[in-house]
Amino acid sequence: MPDPMRSYLDFEKPVAELDSKIDELHALAAGGSNIGEEIAKIEEKALAALTELYAALTPWQKTQVARHPQRPHCVDYIEGLITEFTPLAGDRKFGEDEALIGGFGRFRGESVCVLGQEKGFSTETRLKHNFGMARPEGYRKAVRLMEMADRFGLPVLSLVDTAGAYPGIGAEERGQAEAIARSTEACLKLGVPNVAVVIGEGGSGGAIAIATANKVLMLEHAIYSVISPEAASSILWRDSSKAQEAATSMKITAQDLLRFGVIDQILTEPRGGAHRDSAAMIAKAGDAIAKSFADLSSLDSDAIRAQRRQKFLDIGRKLG
């Protein structure tokens, strides 16, 4: 789990100052000072400031929130939503990739296959999970698990949180592009319902490889894009400092993507972002996932494939 000490983003400085003042006053109150009324006033002011700030986030600020180090990760959602989770390892071709977690468990009493990118929350775990950037063996593991889920009639849940597939030389030598394509194809071929939730970053093919789903949900302050704002600004303007401008131009927010029909639902985050109340966010995501699976439960295998195929064809026709 992330460090319980709250971390503030640069644009949250006014809120950080108020929270610091509140902490100081609470310390004084613990020493016997009668300042409860003053504390209440500043807490109300801090809450109002946080509400106002998060009601008008820019796309670049949402990018920062999506990357917040204390935002709940894939492992947190699995821990909060999946019981009897049994992770499976390896692609049966090259090796294991811990950037992409996959396994089977129970979601609200029903067996389910779970896939998700895990970024890690400390130096050690970030290195272990390669910062959530999967290699070819990660996507081939995903294909293996999706094929197992299809064989046994189990729905698939994908938790998306990656800056993108790993671009290293070794990954390219082992067929990164082909692995992503095969994983996307496996999603499209599934005869069981699949639901994807973009919980943080949805970066390019690395995300779509497990998010080509019947239903795509997205957290309010998550992002979903073909390339990072920093990389886009470097390519388009030869200047990485234009990342804020790129973020706006690329239409990467949940609000933009819902309007374009790329996603199906926005999950409202707690005031101040998912990291301020992880338990509430995970519970809300669980309810939305359950409803999505219920909505698809009446469809047979052919109808499930047809609905998914038509969904992505419609996106291409609308935005192409």
UniProtKB/Swiss-Prot annotation:
Gene3D superfamilies the record matches: 2-enoyl-CoA Hydratase, Chain A, domain 1
Annotated disulfide bonds: none
Pfam families documented for this protein:
ACCA
Q: Which UniProt keywords apply?
A: ATP-binding, Cytoplasm, Fatty acid biosynthesis, Fatty acid metabolism, Lipid biosynthesis, Lipid metabolism, Nucleotide-binding, Transferase
InterPro entries named in the record: Acetyl_CoA_COase_a_su (IPR001095), ClpP/crotonase-like_dom_sf (IPR029045), COA_CT_C (IPR011763)
Q: Where in the cell is it found?
A: Cytoplasm
Which pathway features in its UniProt record?
Lipid metabolism; malonyl-CoA biosynthesis; malonyl-CoA from acetyl-CoA: step 1/1
Record-listed E.C. numbers: 2.1.3.15
Name the family the entry cites: Belongs to the AccA family.
Subunit description: Acetyl-CoA carboxylase is a heterohexamer composed of biotin carboxyl carrier protein (AccB), biotin carboxylase (AccC) and two subunits each of ACCase subunit alpha (AccA) and ACCase subunit beta (AccD).
- Describe the function of this protein: Component of the acetyl coenzyme A carboxylase (ACC) complex. First, biotin carboxylase catalyzes the carboxylation of biotin on its carrier protein (BCCP) and then the CO(2) group is transferred by the carboxyltransferase to acetyl-CoA to form malonyl-CoA.
Q: State what protein this is by name.
A: Acetyl-coenzyme A carboxylase carboxyl transferase subunit alpha
Whichever gene encodes this chain, its name is accA
